[in-house]
Each structure stands twice: as C-alpha cells, then as structure tokens.
Design a protein with these regions (language model features):
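The feature represents the membrane-entry module of six-transmembrane cation channels
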Residues: 3-537
Length: 537
C-alpha cells in the first residue's frame, strides 16, 4: 500500500515513516539528523498501540469506489479521499493488502471477479433465460441462420444465439459497472494523499485500520513476500485479533484473474463462434463439414487452454517458491525502499527501523516474529493458496457460457420441433446443466492437477511448450469420455418417451463425480501445512 504513505516529492514506494515527523511536528532542518532514533521510537509506539490518531482518521470506502474509472485508485490516483467516510471499530469489512510492485491490471481483473463475478453470472443467466423464453415464444426473431431450421439444418445444431448474446452482454456490463457496497480499507482512498497533516495521522493509525477490519484480502503476487511493508501488514492483522479469535484471511493470486477470464473467453469462442460457423457449414455443405467444424473447435481450444496451462504452471511454481521462501524467511532478506534509496527522504527516518520497533513491541523480539512467519503465516499462505484459488464455485462461474449455449439449443427446440417441443427443450436444459456443473469442472480439475504435477520448466527450453500438451490432451480425453457416456445414456428407454430421463441419468453420473472430486481431491495443490502452536484459519 505504498502510495498512501508518500509525500508528493517521494517516489511511489513502501514508506511508513517518510516525513511523518515533519508532517506531524515539523522541526528545524539542522536538528533533524540529531533525533531520528527518538522519532522512530515515537512513531513505533503510536503505530504499535493500534489506536487512531484522532476519531475522524478511521475511515473506510466502498469496494465499488475502487472500480471507478476502470480501477483509477489501483493506478495510484491521489485525489480520491472524498470517496471515503468515517467509520467505527470493526465496521470495516475487509482490509485490502497488496504490493504496489505487482501488475495493476491483474489486480483490477482479480478484484472484479472476486466482487462482481458471482453477481454478473447470476444476472447474465437470468437474462439469457428470459431471452430463451422470448425466442421460444416467437417474440424474438431468428437472429442468425436459416428461417426454417427443420428443413435446412440438422437438429443437433439448432441454436437461437439470443441467450449467448444477452448473457455475454449482461455479464460484461455487470462485471465492469456493478458497484458493490462492502466497506473496505484501501490506502489511497482512506488515507488523505493531499493534506500532509491528515496524511501523517493516517499513517500513524495504520494499526487501528487493521484492528478495525474484520477480515483481510491479500492480492498475492510474486513480489508480496519480498516487501517489508506487506508482511508487516499480515503480522499486524494477526496480532490485532482477540485471544482465541480465528483470523479471516482471504488470498487471491492476481495471476489467476486474467486466467479465469481467458477460460471464459475460450468457452465463448468454442461455443458461440463455432455454432455460428456450424449454421453456415451444415446448411450449405455436406460430407466433410463436420470435420471442418471439429478442427475449428479444437484450434480454439488449443490456443486458449495452452495459454491457461502455461499460466497455471507458472502459478504453481510461484506457490512452491513462496512456500520455500517463507519456510526460511528472515527480516534481513526483505526489501525496504527507503534503505534501497539511501534514506533520501524523511530527515534520516528509516521505515525498517520503525517496523522493527513495532514488531518488537508485539512479538517480544525479531526472532519470535520470524518464527511466526515461518509457521503461522506460512501455514496461512499455504492453506489459502491450496484451497481458495480453484474452488468449485469459481470454476462454475467461469464456465457459465456453457449454460447459455444450451439455453439457445433449448429455445430452438421449443420453437421449431414438432413433437412435444417443451419436453425436448427440457432435455437440452438437463444436458446443459450436466455439462456446465459436471463435465466442465472435471475437465478443468484434471487440467489443473496435471499443470501442478508438471509445473517445473523443462531443462531443455525448446521442449517446455510440449509439456502444455499433456493437460490439453487430458481435457480432450475427459470430453471424449463424457460424450461416450452421454451416448450410452441415450440407449435405454426409461420412464417416458423422449430423452429428458436419459439426460437426467447422464447428470446423475457426472454431477456427483464433480462434487466428490472437488470435495476430496481439489483442483489446487495439496501442500503440506506444518504443525504449529499458532492457530490458523
């Protein structure tokens, strides 16, 4: 959260004590160098008490305000303090902890998915369902393809395209413009960046902000554990909890935000673009048109999933590296910009010294803090990195275009088929739910597990891209097995004529399989959590 602590003349780095003495109680330049140790002691005592410098300093903002201007606050804008409001103890829902040395656009995408993704998926599905009903009721025109589907197009490729179109538009609009009202702490908004005196008081009250927060969101990247300030925030948050209270820490790797969006884009391209092409190919061509369609779909899958697999392998490598780094973490190894730049600001005040003095107040000595990082904090990181980034609900949200495509098929069946159209439509809906909630998540889990297993780079750099083929072919194999199983479920005649019962049978196979795999295996790495006397979430 470095920019929140910077005077206008300082570089945008992680500085807790930059000119704080001057901002709170200015002193003559000739005496500034004579009292840095006393000033550092004073600042450390104030920060260590975890109380606000004044009642009006403790402020929060709404999560949606950070998204204004397409993440203007994440880019370090300093004129957003007016978006904050005064709050009270434990009234801040979440403290956002992040490194300003990480990618801004990755953080923006990750936050959008974290806060807006579920709402966007729900609204998009409702909108696509309404569009499907309107098309089935002949209130919407045929958007694309032949006017008479029954004469010019095989029934297996009937699509209305309305559900996918409406769903995609609503999802994008909700993702970008939905404004969640959750109260959060974000440095450049909650700490005044213009008024030096108020800025100094805000810096002095950073412990109070942490103590007033019910949970912490860590936007994790490769630079996070290398920075003194970010690790100090985590330690201070754990220290601020009441005796016996389980700290609530939520970790979101910023590298995975774009990855989930790419997965969704891949699914949209495979289903929507390929369906559009199939309407033209299959209504005009014969013979080899199916092979052209399959080749196009495979090409789209190959490009999208290859990038995803590469990103997953990079993420799993960073998780392994961070686990090793935290296991031997030492204060002497983390970076502090004021030391890197030779203390050119602040009249000799040193961020590192202030932080170290606070740590000694809270943990007794530096060795105790390092031990806690190597045990409790490392266990927290490992627990969150292995559990949260690949939950079933997150994968389902990323695969929601599958449902839109089958809603398009259902609406086309309801409109054009002659024999019990609504029964045929219900069959397509059941089929869509099975693929969306069952087959898709299982294929994703297999891809992630193999990416984790083969995370290390090949010693021969030219062969490394070939490793990405293993998860890709595994996904193709899972889809092939699902298609075979689906066809086998079509064979028996169950309770009623039609295929709805058969699709429910197919769903009865794949849905429990997906739930069991995510419940007992998981798509993330199963990392070893060390035994510690400290409690972890």
């Amino acid at each position: 959260m470095e920019p929140a602590q910077l005077p206008a003349h300082a570089p945008e780095e992680d500085v807790i004590g930059v000119s704080v003495a001057r901002q709170i109680s200015p002193m003559p330049e000739q005496t500034a160098n004579a009292v840095p140790a006393l000033a550092e002691d004073l600042i450390a005592r104030i920060v260590g008490r975890m109380v606000p410098a004044s009642p009006d300093v403790l402020r929060a903002t709404r999560a949606g305000d950070v998204f204004r201007g397409f993440g203007k606050a994440l880019r370090g804008s300093k004129k957003l303090h007016g978006l904050s409001y005064q709050t009270k103890k434990m009234m801040i829902s979440m403290f956002w902890s992040h490194s300003w040395h990480g990618s801004t656009w990755r953080k923006y995408m990750t936050l959008l998915l974290f806060y807006n993704g579920p709402a966007a998926a729900v609204i998009a599905c409702l909108g696509s369902a309404v569009a499907s009903v309107l098309f089935a009721s002949e209130l919407l025109p045929v958007l694309h393809g032949p006017t008479n589907f029954t004469e010019d197009l095989p029934y297996s490729h009937w699509q209305s395209f309305w559900a996918a179109l409406v769903g995609m538009i609503l999802y994008i609009l909700m993702l970008l413009f939905w404004r969640p009202v959750d109260s959060i702490f974000f440095d450049v908004i909650c700490i005044d960046q213009v008024n030096p005196k108020r800025k100094g008081k805000g810096l002095m009250s950073i412990g109070a902000f942490l103590k007033a927060s019910r949970s912490m969101l860590i936007l994790w990247d490769a630079t996070y554990s290398d920075r003194l300030w970010t690790m100090f925030e985590v330690a201070a948050f754990l220290r601020s909890r009441e005796e016996g209270e389980m700290p609530k820490v939520v970790l979101r790797p910023t590298i995975l935000g774009p990855c989930y969006l790419l997965l969704m884009l891949t699914v949209i391209l495979v289903l929507t673009v390929a369906d559009n092409v199939s309407v033209h190919l299959l209504s005009c061509w014969t013979g080899s048109s199916h092979f052209v369609l399959w080749a196009l779909q495979f090409l789209i899958c190959f490009c999208g999933l290859s990038v995803n697999t590469t990103t997953f392998r990079e993420y799993f490598r960073s998780v392994s590296d961070s686990q090793e780094q935290l296991a031997s973490w030492r204060l002497a190894d983390v970076r502090c910009t004021c030391c890197d730049t030779g203390h050119v600001c602040g009249g000799g005040l040193c961020d590192r010294e202030v932080v170290l003095k606070c740590i000694c107040q809270w943990f007794g000595n530096l060795e105790n803090f390092e031990s806690r990082v190597q045990t409790e904090i490392m266990d927290t990181f490992v627990h969150e990195q292995s559990r949260q980034p690949f939950t079933y609900s997150q994968v389902v949200i990323a695969l929601v275009p599958l449902l839109w495509s089958y809603l398009d098929s259902a609406s086309a069946y309801a409109r054009f088929t002659e024999w019990d159209p609504w029964l045929q439509a219900s069959c397509q809906i059941a089929r869509g739910l099975a693929w969306w909630l069952g087959v898709g998540p299982v294929a994703f889990l297999i891809q992630c597990r193999l990416a984790c297993r083969f995370q290390r780079k090949c010693s021969w750099a030219r062969c490394d891209p070939l490793i990405n083929l293993l998860p890709l072919f595994a996904v193709v194999f899972v889809i092939f097995v699902a298609i075979v199983l689906e066809q086998l479920c079509f064979v028996p005649t169950l309770f009623h004529d039609g295929q709805t019962d058969n699709m429910l049978l197919f769903a009865a196979f794949v849905l429990p399989s997906a739930w069991l795999l995510y419940g007992y295996v998981g798509a993330g790495p199963r990392l070893t959590v060390s035994t510690s006397k400290h409690s972890i979430p």
